[in-house]
Structure formats: C-alpha cells, structure tokens
C-alpha cells in the first residue's frame, strides 16, 4: 500500500486528485531555505552582534545551518498543509538537511552540511540510474512532473537526470574541498540553481518530442 505522504507517479493521478502549490509559492518554498542559508552565513556576524544569544551557536556557518534547518521544516510544513502530500525530492532532501545539519551543530564540524548536496545528488542519481538498470524509469516518482511522456521519453529523460545528479555531486565535492566556506555557500545558492535551470531548459526538445497527446495518454 502506498503511503499518503509520498506523491505517486504524476501520470497515475487525475487532475481532480492533484492539489498543487501555486508556482510562485512553490518556487519560494524551494529557494527560501537556500536564501536563508546564504544570507545567514553572509550576515552571521552582524546577526550575532545584534542578537548575542545567537553567538552560542557558533560561527556564521553554524548559525546558517541552524536557520537552514528551521526554514526547511517550515517550507515542508507549508507544502504539506496546502497539498497533504510531500514530493519525494524535497522530502528526502529535507531529511538529509536535518540529519547532516544536526551532525554539523552537534560536532561543530561544517563538513557534514557541506557533504549534504553530495549525498542527496548521489542518492537520486543512483536511484534513477539503478532503476534504468532494472528496466524502470523512476523520474516521475522523483519529480512532481506535470507532463506526460512515452516510455522512450521517460527512459531518455531519466538517464539524463541521473547523470546530471551525479555531475552535481562531483561538482559539490570539488568546490567544498578546494574553496572557502563562503565560496561554497555562494556557489550552492547562485551556481547550482542557474546550472539546473539551464539543464532543465535543454531538456525541452526531448520533452516536446516524446510528449503524449490527451488521446494517447488515455489510450496508454
């Protein structure tokens, strides 16, 4: 039996079953925690000066981690309150944020929060590529997609996203291991998002080529 928290494959749901978050709010819920993380790290010393109690958390990166965790929980709660479902990707990412964020604060070691993107991207990349190995295109379960594709389209798109996730994991490892914390935080917020947007736009020809019409979708 499928757990109600998890979203099913979008192709299996009718429009009446879907309770979607408005696009702008959805974008805000996805970007909000990252922006909190960036500005808390960039302005951490100022925040600590203004609110001395925050100094007990530690350096700006630790304050940013704590606020990132709080913002992530709030974003998931808002999404749940509006749709009564949690898409797989934000849910898994949120769980990893809480686990690795807690380790970061407990051990006072920012390595854990820096490895979070590596873990999440490797996990999703492994799931997608592993699914293809067993003949399953699992992209519909990872993303809350609104489009319908034929089987070949799902396979190709799943392969591309699986490889892209692995690419992001490798890039994150290179950046956090070779550059300063501030550079890594900036790249995480202002580098990964543009790269992802460009990659997504590059998939539009494939999506258009393999999109199903309403008649084809009903017949399938």
From Swiss-Prot:
Q: Which UniProt keywords apply?
A: Cell inner membrane, Cell membrane, Membrane, Transmembrane, Transmembrane helix
InterPro entries listed in its UniProt record: YciB
Where does it localize? Cell inner membrane
Give the family this protein belongs to, as stated in its UniProt record. Answer: Belongs to the YciB family.
* GO CC annotation terms, alphabetical: plasma membrane
Membrane topology per record: Multi-pass membrane protein
Q: Which domain of life is it from?
A: Bacteria
SS bond list = none
User: Any stretches that span the bilayer, and where are they?
Assistant: 20-40, 57-77, 86-106, 123-143, 156-176, 187-207
Gene that this polypeptide is encoded by: yciB
* Name under which the protein is recorded: Inner membrane-spanning protein YciB
Main location per the UniProt record: membrane
The record describes the protein's role as:
Plays a role in cell envelope biogenesis, maintenance of cell envelope integrity and membrane homeostasis.
């Amino acid at each position: 039996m499928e757990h109600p928290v998890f979203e099913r494959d979008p192709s299996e749901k009718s429009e009446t079953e879907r309770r979607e978050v408005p696009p702008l709010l959805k974008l805000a819920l996805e970007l909000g925690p990252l922006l909190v993380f960036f500005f808390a790290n960039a302005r951490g010393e100022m925040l600590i000066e203004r609110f001395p109690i925050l100094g007990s958390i530690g350096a700006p990166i630790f304050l940013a981690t704590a606020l990132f965790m709080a913002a992530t929980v709030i974003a998931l709660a808002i999404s749940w309150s509006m749709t009564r479902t949690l898409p797989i990707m934000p849910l898994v990412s949120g769980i990893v944020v809480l686990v690795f964020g807690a380790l970061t604060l407990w051990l006072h070691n920012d390595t854990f929060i820096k490895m979070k993107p590596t873990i999440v991207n490797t996990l999703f990349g492994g799931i997608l590529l592993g699914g293809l190995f067993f003949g399953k295109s699992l992209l519909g379960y990872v993303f809350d997609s609104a489009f319908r594709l034929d089987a070949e389209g799902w396979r190709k798109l799943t392969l591309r996203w699986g490889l892209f996730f692995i690419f992001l994991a490798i890039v994150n490892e290179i950046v956090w291991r070779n550059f300063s914390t501030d550079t890594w935080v900036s790249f995480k917020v202002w580098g990964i998002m543009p790269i992802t947007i460009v990659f997504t736009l590059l998939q539009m020809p494939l999506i258009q080529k393999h999109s199903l019409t309403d008649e084809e979708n009903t017949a399938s």
